[in-house]
A protein has these predicted regions:
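Short catalytic/ligand-binding loop motif for oxyanion handling, primarily in non-cytosolic enzymes
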Residues: 41-42, 72-74, 96-100, 132-137, ...
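The substrate-binding groove and active-site-proximal loops of carbohydrate-active enzymes
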Residues: 32-41, 65-67, 99-104, 195-198, ...
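Metal-dependent polysaccharide deacetylase catalytic core of the NodB/CE4 family, i.e.
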Residues: 58-149, 188
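Extreme N-terminal basic, low-complexity initiation segments
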Residues: 2-12
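C-terminal domain-boundary segment and adjacent tail
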Residues: 22-23, 56-58, 70, 160-171, ...
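A cross-family glycoside hydrolase active-site/sugar-binding cleft signature
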Residues: 34-36, 63-67, 89-91, 127-129, ...
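Active-site beta->alpha N-cap acidic-glycine motif
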Residues: 14-85
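His/Asp/Glu-enriched short active-site or ligand-binding loop at hydrolase and phosphoryl-transfer sites
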Residues: 139-187, 234
């Protein structure tokens, strides 16, 4: 087995997840359901909700943006048994903060993704913690000594060269290489974006933890909804281009 990261550290929450299509709770006849922060922690994996939804909505599918360093081989094996309705995508490496990718350059990004790929269970779909894949456009510049400051496009470039689809926010558009394969989540009315754990925010629509969705919003799908993985929606051309 491999070493699992320090899963007791706190993943910070900040207000970058503003109200938009990403945090809309209107009914979806077509749904690409995805969530952030799957890992081993009992209060961060949300397994009870996943099985509740699958039992209640037999067609249910979900793409889990999983923290590789914090997810054991045993957890991956358990999730892989359900790969007909659970898809594993990549959410940083250890998510020690929302600015993890500010500490990456091209080579470090490549090495992390090679380690992820060696496990053989993850789709080549990546989302940066806190959406901070490049500095500045989100209002949070990187320290000049940070690795990302040498080349603000380094993470994009490495992921693109390795064939990853990058899930991103609209405000990062000016910082992307033109050849990057990007899904701008702000523009996608078929995506249901959630977290495995409660988001304590004053923005009612931004309260998108699994339990909050059930108790405060209600699931924006039913048994007539057609569900697709992120990978399926990409392959079928279902995502809208970024509205730059």
């Amino acid at each position: 087995g491999r070493r699992i990261g320090n899963i007791s550290s706190i993943i910070t929450v900040w207000s970058v997840c503003s109200t938009n299509m990403m945090n809309s709770w209107v009914y979806r006849p077509l749904a690409v359901v995805e969530s952030d922060d799957t890992c081993d922690r009992w209060d961060r994996n949300g397994m009870n909700f996943l099985f509740h939804w699958k039992a209640k909505y037999p067609k249910f599918k979900i793409s889990l943006f999983t923290i590789p360093e914090r997810t054991s081989e045993e957890m991956l094996e358990l999730l892989w048994r359900h790969n007909d309705w659970v898809e594993l995508c990549v959410h940083g490496w250890n998510h020690e903060s929302n600015f993890e990718c500010y500490g990456w350059d091209y080579d470090r990004t490549t090495r992390f993704m090679e380690r992820v790929e060696s496990l053989g269970v993850y789709k080549k779909i990546f989302k940066a913690p806190g959406w901070t894949i490049t500095p500045g456009y989100n209002g949070y510049p990187a320290d000049e000594k940070a690795l990302i400051s040498k080349d603000p496009q380094a993470v994009y470039k490495a992921l693109t060269d390795k064939g990853y689809v990058i899930i991103d926010r609209h405000y990062n558009a000016p910082g992307r290489p033109e050849n990057a394969k990007v899904v701008c989540i702000d523009d996608q009315d078929i995506v249901v974006h959630m977290h495995t754990w409660p988001m304590e925010t004053g923005d009612k629509n931004g309260r998108n933890g699994y339990q909050q969705v059930v108790e405060e919003h209600g699931e924006p799908w039913d048994n007539n909804t057609e569900f697709y993985f992120m990978s399926e929606a990409w392959e079928r051309g279902m995502f809208k281009p970024c509205q730059k």
